[in-house]
């Protein structure tokens, strides 16, 4: 008999504070999937790494949505995972100490592994 695994959604975010709507929708969708009992991994690459950087994520607001900080905190509290591209943070002179609690710095191998295990991968 096949295993009955939960759905897994990987959401890749490449936009940061410069595009607050795309940045916010990443976490709206992640929280919605968690509410539906899916496993969720948010991958932050390129400017998306700012969404898990102290001093940035607290100041992202998109019209019609909850503040990004509230959505990020909710995603982590509900059991979602946030992984952050190490080369991307290094290119932006962001240290791992500047990442929010719960954000995991990772390299390409981990990201590819998460994607290969996913039921669905989307990008914002």
Briefly describe each language-model feature range.
Residues 23-38, 42:
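Histidine-anchored nucleotide/phosphate-binding helix
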Residues 1-5:
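Basic/polar N-terminal segments that are highly enriched at the extreme N-terminus
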Residues 91-94, 98-117, 122-123:
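C-terminal structural segments of small proteins and small subunits
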Residues 11-24, 56:
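Short, glycine-rich nucleotide/cofactor-binding loops
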Residues 59-86:
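A glycine-rich helix N-cap at a beta->alpha junction
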Residues 58-63, 98-102:
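Short, flexible loop segments at the rims of nucleotide/cofactor-binding pockets, characterized by
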Residues 40-45, 82-86:
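Short internal beta-strands
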Residues 48-62:
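N-terminal beta-loop-helix "entrance" segment that forms/cooperates
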């Amino acid at each position: 008999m096949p295993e009955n695994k939960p759905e897994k959604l990987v959401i890749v975010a490449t936009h940061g504070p410069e595009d607050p709507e795309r940045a916010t929708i990443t976490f709206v969708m992640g929280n919605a999937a968690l509410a539906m009992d899916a496993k969720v991994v948010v991958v932050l690459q390129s400017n998306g790494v700012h969404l898990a950087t102290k001093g940035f994520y607290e100041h992202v607001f998109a019209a019609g949505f909850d503040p990004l900080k509230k959505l990020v905190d909710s995603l982590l509290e509900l059991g979602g995972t946030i992984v952050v591209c190490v080369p991307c943070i290094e290119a932006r002179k962001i240290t791992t100490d500047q990442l929010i609690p719960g954000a995991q710095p990772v390299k390409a191998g981990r990201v590819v592994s998460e994607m290969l295990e996913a039921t669905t991968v989307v990008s914002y």
